[in-house]
């Protein structure tokens, strides 16, 4: 089969999807990638479903002009709000992969205590998430809306006093009943794993959906016969609606961390 060198498109409301792109670069190192972050309109988690759908379709149109062969919606909020409509519109042209919280592995670990799901308010309010919760109704799961957290990470604040103070206010009150695992339901949040561990000061499992998403992407590339056969390392291009050097530099910095 001829090598398929067209890039894989990644999209997020900002720099968060870089956490998923990092995993893809590890597993699919010979693929080319193009990433679009919509930091100008971030955060998506406080917008209406219709607003998020419109912004998501605008982002996909941008990526289609880059001649992508597959699409990864590396944003939990956009996946919740728009993945069904995206697949209706584009799945006959290319595979479309979304992301969801890594609730299944958290439940399967069978640890004592509550499973905390940190996510944006919209992700937690959407029917897609509620259906996911119903599948694990026998487990002790506590949704934790985290308004304002995406904004801190977009500013590059992944460690230090400000982010730790925010996390303390959210997480410390939940420690009393025991925490079995923390599930990161937003692709921005893996960048603060160290800070979460520091605040909780205990052996808590912290899980995100990046690996599962990339495994699904790999399966889809094989299914559609569009995986790259080249042996050399692929190229990565990052774009952002904010059109500022700061956000592009932050994106590449997060990719390398």
Curated annotation (Swiss-Prot):
EC number of this enzyme: 5.1.1.3
Species name: Clostridium kluyveri (strain ATCC 8527 / DSM 555 / NBRC 12016 / NCIMB 10680 / K1)
Coiled-coil region list: none
Keyword Ribosomal protein: no
Primary gene name: murI
Family designation: Belongs to the aspartate/glutamate racemases family.
Lineage: Bacteria, Bacillati, Bacillota, Clostridia, Eubacteriales
Single Gene Ontology BP annotation: regulation of cell shape
Molecular function as annotated in GO: glutamate racemase activity
Major enzyme class: isomerase
Pathway per the UniProt entry: Cell wall biogenesis; peptidoglycan biosynthesis
Protein name per UniProt: Glutamate racemase
Free-text function comment from the UniProt entry: Provides the (R)-glutamate required for cell wall biosynthesis.
Entry keyword Coiled coil: no
């Amino acid at each position: 089969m001829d090598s398929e060198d067209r890039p894989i498109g990644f999209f997020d409301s900002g720099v968060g999807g870089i956490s998923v792109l990092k995993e893809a670069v590890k597993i699919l190192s010979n693929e080319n990638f193009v990433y679009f972050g919509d930091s100008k309109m971030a955060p998506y988690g406080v917008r209406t479903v219709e607003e998020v759908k419109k912004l998501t379709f605008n982002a996909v149109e941008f990526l289609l002009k880059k001649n992508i062969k597959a699409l990864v919606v590396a944003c939990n909020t956009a996946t919740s709000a728009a993945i069904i409509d995206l697949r209706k519109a584009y799945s006959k042209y290319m595979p479309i992969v979304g992301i969801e919280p890594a609730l299944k592995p958290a439940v399967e670990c069978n640890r004592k205590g509550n499973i905390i799901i940190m996510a944006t308010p919209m992700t937690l309010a959407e029917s897609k998430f509620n259906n996911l919760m119903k599948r694990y109704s026998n487990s002790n799961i506590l949704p934790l809306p985290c308004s304002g957290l995406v904004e801190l990470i977009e500013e590059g604040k992944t460690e230090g006093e400000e982010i730790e103070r925010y996390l303390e206010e959210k997480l410390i009150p939940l420690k009393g009943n025991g925490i079995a695992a923390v599930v990161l339901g937003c692709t921005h949040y893996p960048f603060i794993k160290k800070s979460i561990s520091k605040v909780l000061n205990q052996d808590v499992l912290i899980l995100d959906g990046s690996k599962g998403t990339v495994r699904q992407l790999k399966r889809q590339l094989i299914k559609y016969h569009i995986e790259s056969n080249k042996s050399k390392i692929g190229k990565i291009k990052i774009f952002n609606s904010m059109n500022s050097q700061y956000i592009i530099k932050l994106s590449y910095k997060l990719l390398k961390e």
